[in-house]
C-alpha cells in the first residue's frame, strides 16, 4: 500500500491544481460515488471525485491518472445496476454531471449533439417543443454518457432500437488521454 500511496497523492495533487474546488475527497461524496442503485455489489468509494466541465478537462484528468497508474471510474448519475460505479481499487471517480449541455439540435436531420452528462429527461425536456424525443428509456433517468457506456436499451427498443442504433458518433477520451471522434452525421444506409 505504501508504494501506491505516493503516486496517488501526486496524482491527486496534480488534479487539485487543474480543477481546484472541483476535486473533492469528502467522505460523503466519495461514498455516494462508490455506490450504484443495485444492492448486489459492496459499495467501494474512490480516493477522490473530480467534476470536469469539458472534454479537454476529461482528457487532462485521464492523462494525469494514466501517468500515475491511478484507476479511473466514470460516473453519470449513479443509476448503474451492474456495479459500474464501484471503485474496487480506489482511484478517481470522474463525475460528468457538469458536462450537461445540449450542444445543438438538427430538427431536419432528426439528430442532436449532447455532452455526456445530459440526462434522458433533460434531453426530452429540451426537445419537447420540436416534436422530437429521445426514445431510449432504460427505466432510470440515466445520462447519455452512461447509457452509451452500457449500451442501454429499454421498453422502446423493439420500435426504436437500442442506444447503438440511435448514436451517429461519439467523442471519446482514450485511456491515455487522447481525444478521438468516431462516426459522423451521415447515417449508414447499406
Language-model segments: what does each one mean?
Residues 1-63, 79-110, 160:
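N-terminal flexible segment immediately upstream of the FAD-binding catalytic core
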Residues 24-25, 74, 136:
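A generic structural-conservation signal
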Residues 61, 68, 123:
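Aromatic/hydrophobic pocket-lining residues that form π-stacking "cages" and hydrophobic walls in ligand
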Residues 70-71, 133:
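Residue-level detector of anion-binding/catalytic polar loops
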Residues 76-79, 139:
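Short, ordered loop/turn segments at secondary-structure junctions
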Residues 101-108, 112-190:
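FAD-binding subdomain of flavoenzyme oxidoreductases
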Amino acid at each position: 500500500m505504501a508504494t501506491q500511496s505516493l503516486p496517488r497523492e501526486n496524482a491527486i495533487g496534480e488534479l487539485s491544481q487543474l480543477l481546484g474546488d472541483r476535486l473533492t475527497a469528502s467522505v460523503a461524496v466519495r461514498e455516494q460515488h462508490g455506490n450504484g442503485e443495485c444492492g448486489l455489489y459492496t459499495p467501494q468509494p474512490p480516493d477522490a471525485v473530480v467534476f470536469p466541465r469539458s472534454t479537454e478537462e476529461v482528457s487532462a484528468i485521464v492523462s494525469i491518472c494514466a501517468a500515475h497508474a491511478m484507476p479511473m471510474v466514470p460516473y453519470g448519475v449513479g443509476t448503474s445496476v451492474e456495479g459500474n460505479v464501484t471503485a474496487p481499487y480506489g482511484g478517481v471517480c470522474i463525475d460528468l454531471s457538469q458536462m450537461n449541455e445540449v450542444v445543438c439540435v438538427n430538427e431536419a436531420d432528426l439528430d442532436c449533439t449532447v455532452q455526456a452528462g445530459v440526462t434522458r429527461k433533460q434531453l426530452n425536456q429540451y426537445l419537447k417543443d420540436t416534436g422530437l424525443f429521445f426514445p431510449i428509456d432504460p427505466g432510470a433517468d440515466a445520462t447519455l454518457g452512461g447509457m452509451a457506456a452500457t449500451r442501454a436499451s429499454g421498453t422502446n427498443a423493439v420500435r426504436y432500437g437500442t442506444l447503438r442504433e440511435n448514436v451517429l458518433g461519439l467523442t471519446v477520451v482514450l485511456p491515455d488521454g487522447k481525444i478521438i471522434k468516431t462516426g459522423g452525421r451521415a447515417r449508414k444506409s447499406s
